[in-house]
């Protein structure tokens, strides 16, 4: 992968159209999680330091090509100004002359790109209209890179283009994790359904040395091996697919790790009475809601031998104690190895980040991706249009 960064661009006196992802949660008109806003600060700061005028392009929600007032980006303005420590000009529909008349140190936020029907269609006319506003295009929205939209893909083919600091960090971390990794490589994949992560599992077994499967997905694999999983969430219709993945892994020399012991309960609620049992002894009326301590001990051994770890999805029902034990313990083991300098750890996906934050170890991982769908599609081995456009620029 080769792409230009801000270091390769002459920005002084230039209008820099900067695609960012500030699609943040909002309640009662207030941003409730500023993580994505905070992570674009280095890019905006660097553009200003190099004499450029950043014009921020972003989407918010899914207005589907129509103006929806409650999805205006104006709502993020206070949080954006606080993160940057400077005022931001909100110009819903900027034109070139207006931008050229602004003082050099100005930051501009344009209106929701998805208000325009041409955005999600990657309409060439919209891409050209956007490109006419600036001199340079900077994509700092890896989390939107799996979408071939006018502001992520079309525009990059019309202007000198580069990756912003967050995009650069994401791409370098992911390349380090799966492109040219330090081996052995272990992937942890959790979540509810095999059907949503088929492409991911199929790609990973050919690229990693160890694959840890957790959450509801593990139940499907256990059932495919003839193990009774009781009343647990499981996709029994995916049994043949699960067996095919296991056979593919065996051919590729990838070891699959499933729970050895399980935590079961008859109610899915906080504080519900639970038991820890061997994986083969799940009661018919009970649900598997977490992996047990024997499984965690085995995972710690896998992590101790590994040099690179990629994590997507929790190992159990981490939202509800006590079914967060395996996720928390495994996360802490990975974090400890990272701090000791023996393991490179990269994690992504909404539930994954929430689980690592809950375990209190997110800051100890080598890299936490802000992307959801883009992170998954990259792990699936797919080409991301927003990245491909930068490579072609």
Curated annotation (Swiss-Prot):
User: What EC identifiers does the entry list?
Assistant: 2.7.2.3
What GO cellular component term, any one, is given? Answer: cytosol
Annotated residues that bind ATP are located at 197, 319, 349-352
Cell membrane in keyword set: no
The top EC class is: transferase
Keyword list, A-Z:
ATP-binding, Cytoplasm, Glycolysis, Kinase, Nucleotide-binding, Transferase
Gene3D superfamilies registered for this protein in UniProt: Phosphoglycerate kinase, N-terminal domain
**Pathway, per Swiss-Prot/TrEMBL?**
Carbohydrate degradation; glycolysis; pyruvate from D-glyceraldehyde 3-phosphate: step 2/5
Give residues annotated as binding substrate.
Answer: 21-23, 36, 59-62, 114, 147
Keyword Transport assigned to the entry: answer is no
Q: Which reaction does it catalyse?
A: (2R)-3-phosphoglycerate + ATP = (2R)-3-phospho-glyceroyl phosphate + ADP
Q: Where in the cell is it found?
A: Cytoplasm
Q: Which family does it belong to?
A: Belongs to the phosphoglycerate kinase family.
Assembly and oligomerization = Monomer.
Q: What's the name of the protein?
A: Phosphoglycerate kinase
Taxonomic source organism? Dinoroseobacter shibae (strain DSM 16493 / NCIMB 14021 / DFL 12)
């Amino acid at each position: 992968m080769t792409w230009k960064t801000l270091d390769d661009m002459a920005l002084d006196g230039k209008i820099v159209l900067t695609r960012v992802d500030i699609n943040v949660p909002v309640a009662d008109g207030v941003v409730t999680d500023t993580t994505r806003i905070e992570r674009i600060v280095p890019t905006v700061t660097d553009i200003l330091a190099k004499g450029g005028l950043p014009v921020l392009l972003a989407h918010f929600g899914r207005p589907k090509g129509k103006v929806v007032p409650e999805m205006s980006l104006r709502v993020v303005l206070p949080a954006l100004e606080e993160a940057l420590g400077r005022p931001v000009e909100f110009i819903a529909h900027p034109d070139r002359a207006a931008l050229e008349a602004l003082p050099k140190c100005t930051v501009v936020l344009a209106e929701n790109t998805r208000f325009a029907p041409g955005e999600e269609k990657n309409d060439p006319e919209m891409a050209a209209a956007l490109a006419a506003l600036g001199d340079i295009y900077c994509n700092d929205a890896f989390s939107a890179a799996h979408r071939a939209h006018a502001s992520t893909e079309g525009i990059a083919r019309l202007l000198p283009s580069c990756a912003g600091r967050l995009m650069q960090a994401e791409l370098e971390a992911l390349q380090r994790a799966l492109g040219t990794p330090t081996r052995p490589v272990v992937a942890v994949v959790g979540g509810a359904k095999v059907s949503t992560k088929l492409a991911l599992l199929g790609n990973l077994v050919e690229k990693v040395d160890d694959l840890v499967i957790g959450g509801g997905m593990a139940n499907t694999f256990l059932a495919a091996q003839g193990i009774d999983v009781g009343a647990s969430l499981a996709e029994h219709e995916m049994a043949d697919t699960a067996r095919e993945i296991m056979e593919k892994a065996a051919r590729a020399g990838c070891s699959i790790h499933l729970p050895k012991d399980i935590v079961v309960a008859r109610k899915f609620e906080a504080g519900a009475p639970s038991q820890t049992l061997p994986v083969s002894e799940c009661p018919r009326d009970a649900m598997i809601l977490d992996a047990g301590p024997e499984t965690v001990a085995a995972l710690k051994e896998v992590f101790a031998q590994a040099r690179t770890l990629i994590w997507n999805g929790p190992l159990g029902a981490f939202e509800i104690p006590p079914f967060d034990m395996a996720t928390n313990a495994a996360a802490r083991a990975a974090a400890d190895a990272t701090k000791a300098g023996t393991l490179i750890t990269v994690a992504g996906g909404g539930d994954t980040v929430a689980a690592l934050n809950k375990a209190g170890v997110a800051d100890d991982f080598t890299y936490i991706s802000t992307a959801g769908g883009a992170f998954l599609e990259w792990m699936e081995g797919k080409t991301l249009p927003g990245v491909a456009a930068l490579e072609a620029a």
